[in-house]
């Protein structure tokens, strides 16, 4: 992982993705003229801080671009749902059905990826302004990252359900801090994307650089220690190491998206558009 420069202090984003798909926030996808209903829902005044009179970037977009924004945010919310399902199963020590739940969420992520990809290709063919092109390129190039994030989260869910009955509780508990941190990174990334918040995008990079790597190394050391102390449990220890590695890579892909978003916002700042 590349070295990163110091980041600004943390400004916590509103946790408008914390609840798992409440109907008011996550309506079923429908084809509507105008902004995607998901974006309108995220602007609920009960969950967002007071804003100035300026219009949110997500709400001021052309209809086609707003639809892409809504679907991209939905991909992030699915990732958060998946991480929450893993975290709750680990906290409660109830792992039955976790893989099936993760498979459903991953399938929805894959479907959204195809929808967004098609929308981007249509936009590219139609001709775009420089700013619109920068937005669609950022989204298009980030789709592979979010798809990989979903893959890694699914792999962790599957391994957790498979090996949890044979693993010690301490092994499973080691995953929780990293999962919580990654969930926070997803929330910050979603807020940065919806609100064009540069600080929130940089928070994603800072959290990965300062905390994810340290937690990953800690988990790897713990896995190696257990492997030495209990060689008969080598398969479980190696699986714990693999889950830690997958979570660390998941964070790397979130950082890749945040870096592209930072570049997009800096470009808009220089052009006086933010």
From Swiss-Prot:
UniProt-listed GO biological process terms: intracellular phosphate ion homeostasis; negative regulation of phosphate metabolic process
InterPro entries listed in its UniProt record: P_transport_PhoU, PhoU-like_sf, PhoU_dom
Listed SUPFAM superfamilies: PhoU-like
Family membership: Belongs to the PhoU family.
Name of the featured protein: Uncharacterized protein DR_2053
Organism, as annotated: Deinococcus radiodurans (strain ATCC 13939 / DSM 20539 / JCM 16871 / CCUG 27074 / LMG 4051 / NBRC 15346 / NCIMB 9279 / VKM B-1422 / R1)
Lineage: Bacteria, Thermotogati, Deinococcota, Deinococci, Deinococcales
């Amino acid at each position: 992982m590349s070295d990163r420069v110091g980041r600004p202090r943390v400004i916590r984003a509103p946790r408008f993705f914390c609840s798992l798909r409440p109907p008011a926030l996550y309506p079923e996808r429908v084809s509507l003229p105008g902004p995607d209903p998901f974006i309108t829902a995220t602007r609920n005044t009960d969950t967002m801080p007071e804003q100035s009179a300026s219009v949110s970037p997500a709400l001021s977009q052309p209809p086609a671009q707003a639809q892409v924004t809504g679907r991209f945010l939905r991909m992030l919310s699915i990732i958060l749902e998946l991480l929450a399902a893993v975290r709750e199963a680990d906290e409660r020590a109830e792992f039955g059905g976790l893989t099936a739940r993760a498979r459903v969420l991953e399938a929805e992520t894959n479907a959204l990826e195809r929808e967004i990809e098609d929308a981007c290709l249509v936009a590219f063919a139609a001709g775009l302004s420089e700013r619109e092109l920068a937005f669609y390129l950022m989204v298009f190039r980030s789709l592979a990252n979010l798809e990989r994030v979903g893959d890694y989260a699914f792999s962790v869910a599957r391994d957790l359900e498979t090996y949890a009955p044979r693993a010690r509780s301490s092994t499973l508990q080691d995953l929780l801090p990293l999962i919580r941190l990654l969930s926070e990174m997803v929330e910050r990334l979603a807020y940065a994307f919806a609100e064009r918040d540069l600080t929130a995008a940089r928070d994603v990079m800072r959290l990965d650089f300062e905390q994810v790597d340290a937690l990953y190394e800690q988990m790897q050391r713990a896995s190696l220690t257990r492997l030495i102390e209990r060689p008969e449990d080598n398969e479980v220890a190696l699986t714990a190491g693999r889950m830690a590695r997958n979570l660390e890579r998941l964070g790397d892909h979130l950082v890749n998206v945040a870096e592209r978003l930072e570049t997009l916002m800096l470009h808009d700042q220089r052009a006086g558009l933010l």
